[in-house]
Design a protein with these regions (language model features):
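Substrate/cofactor-recognition hotspot
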Residues: 1-178
Length: 178
């Protein structure tokens, strides 16, 4: 199953396939202003021209196939993208990449590309739900923290938990109300 084609999902797919990034809230707000001003396709074409306008169709196709996680059938996927881009004016390659991504997202039952399409859709859905404030590589965990019983203390107050992370005065304190 493909993702719901909202402008957010389309932009996240475009950013992931071309830039290897998921868009945070600050950048998404700027993108939405651009979309409001000139429309989605014009925005994608503008971003593409600015960032990749000097690349060949083969370079773009290789970048997209790599970022989509296509390993099986990658040569055929690159050839397909090169063919589609080659049939269009370079001024609409951003929109064309978006159309290729939409077609790819529906290939979940395909014997060759199905697993990659399914994994890609999962990444796009996660990116669309992303509410962070910074832009990070698509699929990146922003931070993790492992708690160990010997170094971390938990104190219970009325309807509130207070966690102290660390054993010095410079520890991190987290209050959780419930």
């Amino acid at each position: 199953m493909s993702f719901v084609p909202t402008s957010t999902a389309i932009v996240q797919s475009f950013a992931g396939a071309l830039y290897g990034r998921q868009i945070g809230t600050v950048t998404m707000a700027a993108v939405n202003r651009d979309i409001d001003n000139v429309g989605l396709n014009s925005t994608l074409n503008s971003y593409f021209a600015f960032s990749f306008g000097n690349e060949t169709a083969t370079q773009v196709a290789t970048r997209v196939v790599t970022n989509l996680g296509i390993t099986e059938g990658s040569a055929n996927a690159i050839a397909y993208i090169v063919g589609v881009l080659g049939s269009k004016s370079a001024s609409v390659w951003g929109q064309t990449v978006s159309e290729i991504l939409a077609a790819f997202s529906s290939m979940t039952a395909d014997a060759t590309y199905g697993a990659a399409a399914t994994a890609w859709n999962t990444k796009v859905e996660a990116a669309a739900a992303y509410t962070g404030t910074t832009d990070v590589a698509i699929g990146t965990v922003v931070s993790t923290f492992t708690l160990t019983a010997s170094k971390h203390k938990k104190q219970r107050f009325t309807n509130r938990f207070l966690f102290n992370f660390g054993n010095t005065s410079a520890c991190i304190r987290l209050s959780v109300f419930h």
